[in-house]
């Protein structure tokens, strides 16, 4: 990455993408924010804010919304991927022809691709493998407990940036860090992605518990045993165990399972109150990654032969229509064992 002020492309103009674009542009970086919906992008330009996702928060002068992937990506030293996991590969594949040969790309997406069970870092690596001329591009992730609205409001937040190279992680850490947005570094990309995605499933479980009007004891048990499932999956994928006690693991798990801004917890709340997943999704205008990620992790756990009882019950509720109260009883009725 050049020592000059880097040009940054943020791919995805939802709440999280816009929030990160505001943060980076607020530091004086020239930021181009891409969205697939031209009408939405035109509205960002005319309103000077993302009134759909972050109303009342102004876009800095150095933030330039665009519906053109080419205009967004050409010349960017840092590319930030912030689109839903189910369209991630398609969007990434479309922007590859415009990538500079030595840029850094960071995924800010917490999900697992359904069809391949790949993390977003894996998806990027798979797609770039067909382009030897882009072999110098470095891939990383950013993860941690970070509601978009609070980041856009400049409320104190801490996250972790991960790259295979500690030096590159440090460079990207410096780009993102502010007096309200503290960034740590890691080289455990797999651990960051597994924990960041899996916590969304546990947030649905916690929401179901709350929707059934269970108390704090039940929520604490779900979070703790959910962390154990996360750790078992991480071990099967050779992740660093310490990552799961960090910001992307326990930190994000606590936030998403308890915070009122959590879309995944809200899905669980509505399920617990008896609403169908079809009804819940029809009422949402923002993506809850945990719904699709539940299926990905369910399939992955079967593939890796990892025991994930809470994940399994969330899957049965969402994809098989199992009664939520029965799922809880089945969890509590499992064979007793040591912790």
From Swiss-Prot:
Pathway: Membrane lipid metabolism; glycerophospholipid metabolism. Pfam families: NAD_Gly3P_dh_C, NAD_Gly3P_dh_N. PROSITE patterns: NAD_G3PDH. InterPro entries: 6-PGluconate_DH-like_C_sf, 6PGD_dom2, G3P_DH_NAD-dep, G3P_DH_NAD-dep_C, G3P_DH_NAD-dep_N, NAD(P)-bd_dom_sf. The lineage of its organism: Bacteria, Pseudomonadati, Thermodesulfobacteriota, Desulfobulbia, Desulfobulbales. It is found in: Cytoplasm. Belongs to the NAD-dependent glycerol-3-phosphate dehydrogenase family. Its EC number is 1.1.1.94. It is an enzyme of class 1 (oxidoreductase). This is Glycerol-3-phosphate dehydrogenase [NAD(P)+]. SUPFAM superfamilies: 6-phosphogluconate dehydrogenase C-terminal domain-like, NAD(P)-binding Rossmann-fold domains. It comes from the Bacteria. NADPH binds at residues 15-16, 36, 110, 148, 263, 287, 289. GO terms for cellular component: cytosol. NCBIfam families: PRK00094.1-2 (NF000940), PRK00094.1-4 (NF000942). Its main location: cytoplasm. GO terms for biological process: carbohydrate metabolic process; glycerol-3-phosphate biosynthetic process; glycerol-3-phosphate catabolic process; glycerophospholipid metabolic process; phospholipid biosynthetic process. One of its GO terms (molecular function) is glycerol-3-phosphate dehydrogenase [NAD(P)+] activity. Catalyzes the reduction of the glycolytic intermediate dihydroxyacetone phosphate (DHAP) to sn-glycerol 3-phosphate (G3P), the key precursor for phospholipid synthesis. The keyword Lipid metabolism applies. Transmembrane segments: none annotated. The active site is at residue 199. Sn-glycerol 3-phosphate binds at residues 110, 144, 146, 199, 252, 262-264. It comes from Desulfotalea psychrophila (strain LSv54 / DSM 12343). The keyword Oxidoreductase applies. The gene is gpsA. Keywords: Cytoplasm, Lipid biosynthesis, Lipid metabolism, NAD, NADP, Nucleotide-binding, Oxidoreductase, Phospholipid biosynthesis, Phospholipid metabolism.
């Amino acid at each position: 990455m050049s020592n000059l002020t880097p040009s940054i492309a943020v791919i995805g103009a939802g709440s999280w993408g816009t929030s990160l674009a505001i943060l980076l542009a607020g530091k004086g970086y020239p930021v181009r924010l891409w969205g697939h919906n031209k009408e939405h992008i035109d509205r960002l330009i005319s309103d000077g804010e993302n009134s759909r996702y972050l109303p009342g928060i102004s876009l800095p002068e150095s933030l330039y919304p665009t519906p053109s992937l080419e205009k967004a990506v050409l010349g960017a030293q840092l590319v930030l991927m912030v689109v839903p996991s189910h369209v991630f590969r398609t969007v990434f594949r479309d922007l590859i022809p415009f990538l500079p040969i030595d840029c850094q790309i960071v995924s800010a997406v917490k999900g697992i691709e359904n069809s391949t069970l790949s993390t977003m870092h894996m998806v990027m690596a798979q797609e770039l493998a067909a382009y030897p001329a882009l072999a110098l591009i470095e891939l990383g992730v950013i993860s941690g407990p970070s509601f978009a609205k609070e980041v856009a409001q400049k409320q104190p937040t801490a996250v972790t940036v991960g790259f295979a190279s500690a030096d590159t992680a440090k460079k990207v850490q410096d780009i993102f860090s502010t007096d309200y947005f503290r960034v740590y570094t890691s080289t455990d990309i797999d651990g960051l992605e597994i924990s960041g995605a899996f916590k969304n499933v546990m947030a649905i479980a916690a929401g179901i518990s709350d929707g059934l009007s269970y108390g704090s004891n039940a929520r604490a048990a779900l979070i703790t045993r959910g962390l154990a499932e996360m750790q078992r999956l991480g071990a099967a994928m050779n992740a660093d165990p310490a990552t799961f006690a960090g910001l992307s693991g326990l930190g994000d798990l606590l936030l998403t399972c308890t915070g009122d801004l959590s879309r995944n917890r809200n899905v669980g709340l509505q399920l617990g109150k008896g609403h169908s997943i079809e009804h819940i999704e029809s009422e949402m205008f923002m993506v809850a990654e945990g719904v699709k990620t539940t299926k990905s992790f369910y399939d992955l756990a079967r593939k890796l032969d990892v025991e994930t009882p809470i994940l399994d019950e969330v899957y049965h509720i969402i994809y098989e229509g199992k009664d939520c109260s029965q799922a809880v009883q089945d969890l509590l009725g499992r064979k007793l064992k040591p912790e």
